[in-house]
Amino acid sequence: MQQLEEVVASALAKIAEATDNNALEALRVEYFGKKGVFTEQMKALAGLSPEERPAAGQLINQAKEKAQNALNERREALTTAELAKKLAAETIDVSLPGRRFENGGIHPVTRTIERIERIFGELGFSAEYGPEIEDDFHNFDALNIPGHHPARTDHDTFYFNPTLMLRTHTSGVQIRTMEKQQPPIRIIAPGRVYRNDYDQTHTPMFHQVEGLLVDENISFSNLKGILHDFLLNFFEEDLQIRFRPSYFPFTEPSAEVDVMGKNGRWLEVLGCGMVHPNVLRSVGIDPEKYSGFAFGMGVERLTMLRYGVNDLRAFFENDLRFLKQFK
């Protein structure tokens, strides 16, 4: 009995002095393992008489339980202390400002497209869209562009085969609209177009917005009035605007529109003209009854003029230092 009390006292003292879970594990093996102190005590019961065994066994179990409880409590205390130490080392100062997540911005080209759509929407135009892979008829034939025209050469057009290509303008949308809708027609056609060119003012892919108005008694003065209103609204300035004669196979007469730049020089901004009678005939519209005008503008060029950008390629290089200026 006295020896058992000494065993328990020794076990409790060692458990109390343990400083980590590894030390506690060693004590568990020492006292409760297969060859542990309490295991040996239980084996020693075999040497007692049958009358003595129950009482002795009860004492050993009580001593074992006392030591086991002390071991469990110490393990829990050490685990709690270790967790508290870890949490203290990883403490977050909740009073500090959080990480700053920057909101994205609308790309300047997208801004320009949305601006153009809004202005023409206020002028009564609706936006129409069409396929970027276009056939020969909608991209060329229906627009009065003959087979010998330079625009049909491989130098300007990305061909899939002799009759299928990446569209070189959004004029095909105008043709498709006139095929399915009789006048009055009042649309713009924004979208991506493709031409085989790459330099400071050209990229193989760029954006265009083309417009079409077809109705009875439409004249060139109607065209001038619409474009004049658009340019003044787009640039938000009382600009000098001029129309000078030009040539496009799908309009007659044709003109190019210039605005006076801040440097005192004229800057070309778009092309336009009265829809050629052959174009109206190709889609089943009587040119004796209806007339119309069309216009087209490069979105990137307008964006460059509006924001003072010198190199068109900057819009497609994804340089955040450049793009953040337009947020």
From Swiss-Prot:
One GO biological process term: phenylalanyl-tRNA aminoacylation
Cofactor dependency: Mg(2+)
Binding site for Mg(2+): E252
Alphabetical list of Pfam families matching this protein: Phe_tRNA-synt_N, tRNA-synt_2d
SUPFAM superfamilies: Class II aaRS and biotin synthetases, tRNA-binding arm
GO cellular component: cytoplasm
Gene Ontology molecular functions: ATP binding; magnesium ion binding; phenylalanine-tRNA ligase activity; tRNA binding
Catalytic activity: tRNA(Phe) + L-phenylalanine + ATP = L-phenylalanyl-tRNA(Phe) + AMP + diphosphate + H(+)
EC number of this enzyme: 6.1.1.20
Compartmental location: Cytoplasm
Keywords: Aminoacyl-tRNA synthetase, ATP-binding, Cytoplasm, Ligase, Magnesium, Metal-binding, Nucleotide-binding, Protein biosynthesis
Cofactor, free-text remark: Binds 2 magnesium ions per tetramer.
Main location: cytoplasm
PANTHER family: PHENYLALANINE--TRNA LIGASE, MITOCHONDRIAL, PHENYLALANYL-TRNA SYNTHETASE
Family statement: Belongs to the class-II aminoacyl-tRNA synthetase family. Phe-tRNA synthetase alpha subunit type 1 subfamily.
Subunit-structure text: Tetramer of two alpha and two beta subunits.
Protein name as it appears in the record: Phenylalanine--tRNA ligase alpha subunit
Species in which this protein is naturally found: Tolumonas auensis (strain DSM 9187 / NBRC 110442 / TA 4)
